[in-house]
Amino acid sequence: MPWLQLRINTTRELAPRVEYAMAKSGSLAVTLQDNADHPIFEPALGETPLWQETRIVGLFEADTDTTAILELVLKKSGLSEAQHQWHILEDKDWEREWMTHYQPIQCGPGFWICPSWTAPPDPQAVNLMLDPGLAFGTGTHPTTFLCLQWLAGENLANKTVIDYGCGSGILGIGALLLGAVSVTGTDIDPQALMATQENVKRNNLPAESFPVYFPDKCPENPVDIVLANILAGPLVELAPALSALLKPGGRLCLSGVLETQKDDLLAAYEPTVEIEQVFQREEWICITGTRRALKSAKE
């Protein structure tokens, strides 16, 4: 059965009113989109920005009275008129549609990320079989790829790891397959913790090798490697905590950061971490370094 989309173009200032009106007028879902190709990569702390030209898209059932719904949306938003368009959305198996576009990715020599529904291109390689589910982390995003590429070049034999903001578990599972002895995962999203556990099982790894926790329950024992692919704001705030999770000489890998945010990250971590490399892919970067030796009380 097809669906109907009502698309209303508006300004940043009016967008919340139109969004509220759409939600109160029987829409099954409401989405806000950029209407002028002005990307917002990450809001500043405490902000929830919108695009100056914003498109509000409401999803309605196919038998919707379009005239009546438009009038109701305008009335509830307090507008006399609005630039709008009704669009027919053909019904599809969206999960299958998405699956056709997700292909194996090589992240290093002999190291592949493969969707669980495809055969690995190189059966003899280290193949991480992944079903992302509802959490982030498929290997396609530049930040995930940069972290995986770094892991592929490290000696992980018998290393202990924390995957902070584990999402689908892709980084931690990659570390285990590349030789790490154990990974501790943490995330604020329960769906992410579930996806991680499912992907651990999918890769035939023992559940005890990758326990997962909410951040307030995560063990604080220092480890050899900390991976954190989240956002710049949280990474800056978490600098003392993430540094404290590293043994002296332990390795840190940070991503989820735009090149324009590099200086803020470096300033936050340089007191405790010797920054070694900054990798870049498109506009995103990955920062790696080594935990400095702890200062003695006499120092």
From Swiss-Prot:
Gene Ontology MF term list: protein-lysine N-methyltransferase activity
Annotated catalysed reactions: L-lysyl-[protein] + 3 S-adenosyl-L-methionine = N(6),N(6),N(6)-trimethyl-L-lysyl-[protein] + 3 S-adenosyl-L-homocysteine + 3 H(+)
EC annotation from Swiss-Prot or TrEMBL: 2.1.1.-
GO cellular component: cytosol
Keywords on record: Cytoplasm, Methyltransferase, S-adenosyl-L-methionine, Transferase
Gene3D superfamilies (UniProt xref): Vaccinia Virus protein VP39
Compartment(s) where it occurs, according to its Swiss-Prot or TrEMBL record: Cytoplasm
Record GO biological process: methylation
InterPro entries for this protein: Ribosomal_L11_MeTrfase_PrmA (IPR050078), Ribosomal_PrmA_MeTrfase (IPR004498), SAM-dependent_MTases_sf (IPR029063)
Major localization class: cytoplasm
Biological function: Methylates ribosomal protein L11.
Protein name: Ribosomal protein L11 methyltransferase
